[in-house]
Amino acid sequence: IKKITEERINMSGHSKFANIKHKKEKNDAAKGKMFTIIGKEIAVAVKEGGADPNNNSKLRDVIAKAKANNMPNDTIERGIKKAAGNASAINYETVRYEGYGPNGIAIIVDALTDNRNRTAANVRNCFTKGGGNVGTQGCVAYMFDEKGQIIIDKEECDMDPDELMMTAIDAGAEDFQDEEDSYEVITDPNEFSVVREALEAAGVAMAQAEVTMIPQNYVELTDDEAIKKMNIIIDRLDEDEDVQQVYHNWDESVSYTHLRAHETPEHL
């Protein structure tokens, strides 16, 4: 087990929790958007599996995600009740778009929409504005692995690291990594709920817990114009109401360091 922790290659070359915190800060600036995203996921989960979390693992996972994003319990409960009383009217469908950003950066966009044509046009426009383009299904998905990912903030975790690792591994986790600011647990998508619930039962607070697409390799951008264009694509996609999640293989930490190195003193 120790060998897993010590020898696992950090796929991004930097702390993933730093990336998570960066995303969370952006979401905090637009908390309404995040709550809308989670609200849709609650509605779909209730429609597919019912309103009782005890009998609906997908709903349990969404509730855990909601709590990790500081959604109030009463808001979660209202969302479940609303979805349960209006299940027949819920007509969201999951749509995935794949494409390329500047310098061939791979991008995957997951959306929940009640109008495919509207969403497709909006997503295509987001790519175009940043100099990218939407590709065909499967054009970049092979560059990612679908995994359950659980991030635990060290400041919020009192459990001994070895005990935490054993709890995760015994529950079925594939991998455990001790990062600078956090612990990262990786699972097979089918084992995600079991591992998350085992950690939850052990009293572990999770900063993030979701099934995600993890890049097999990351790509650096050091050209200022390419960095700006990539940010345009991501920001516009984040602002779209139908977009649930954006995945990419851009190593943002290197690009941020590059931009900071080229800023003049008055910009700092």
Give the residues covered by each predicted segment:
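Conserved small/polar residues in nucleotide/adenosyl-binding loops
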Residues: 257-266
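Short, ordered loop/turn segments at secondary-structure junctions
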Residues: 81, 112-115, 138-141, 155-156, ...
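N-terminal cationic and glycine-rich segments that engage phosphates or anionic surfaces
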Residues: 11-106, 110-126, 131-135, 140, ...
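Extended, positively charged loop/linker patches that create polyanion-binding surfaces
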Residues: 133-180
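Short, Lys/Arg-enriched N-terminal segments with co-localized hydrophobic residues
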Residues: 1-10
